């Protein structure tokens, strides 16, 4: 009986991991699409896709949150399992924000397109680093690889540096 319950719980955790992977892929798609819109001529279809992807990300967040709540209420996990579920809840919140930010980029695309090439290059490079962060963070979570998770911090520093460069370029263009 106890083994059956644990097996069911492990299956549910695997399902949670699979849903996190799907949500991460949606975030990657939204970021890639948003950046592509800023680099090229008008893409109404791609703009619509990014906004729809953000809606899918929002739905996925609710679905995963529901999975987590069911796991917490039905299984009453402790220690490591509780940390896994609480980490998943934090991750989905962060990934949902990434989807929102991709939508924001789409809305700002007309202004970004008018910017200089260096600005766009930094933005594109920053987006690529964010995609790597999303991919590596989910992969480290699913594999429970602490060292890989620590390496994600490096990407965060790189993204911060790109962001600072973009802000500098933006200030230069205003002056």
What are the roles of these predicted feature ranges?
Residues 1-175:
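Cytosolic, long alpha-helical scaffolding segments
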């Amino acid at each position: 009986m106890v083994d059956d319950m644990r097996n069911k719980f492990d299956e549910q955790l695997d399902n949670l991991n699979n849903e996190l992977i799907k949500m991460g892929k949606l975030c990657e798609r939204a970021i890639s699409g948003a950046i592509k819109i800023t680099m090229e001529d008008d893409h109404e279809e791609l703009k619509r896709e990014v906004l729809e992807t953000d809606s899918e990300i929002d739905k996925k967040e609710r679905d995963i949150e529901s999975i987590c709540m069911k796991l917490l209420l039905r299984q009453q996990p402790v220690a490591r399992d509780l940390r896994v579920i609480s980490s998943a809840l934090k991750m989905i919140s962060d990934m949902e924000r990434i989807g929102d930010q991709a939508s924001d980029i789409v809305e700002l695309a007309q202004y970004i397109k008018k910017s200089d090439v260096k600005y766009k290059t930094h933005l594109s490079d920053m987006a690529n680093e964010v995609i790597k962060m999303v991919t590596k963070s989910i992969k480290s979570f699913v594999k429970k690889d602490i060292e890989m998770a620590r390496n994600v911090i490096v990407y965060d520093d790189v993204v911060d540096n790109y962001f600072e460069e973009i802000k500098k370029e933006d200030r230069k263009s205003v002056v």
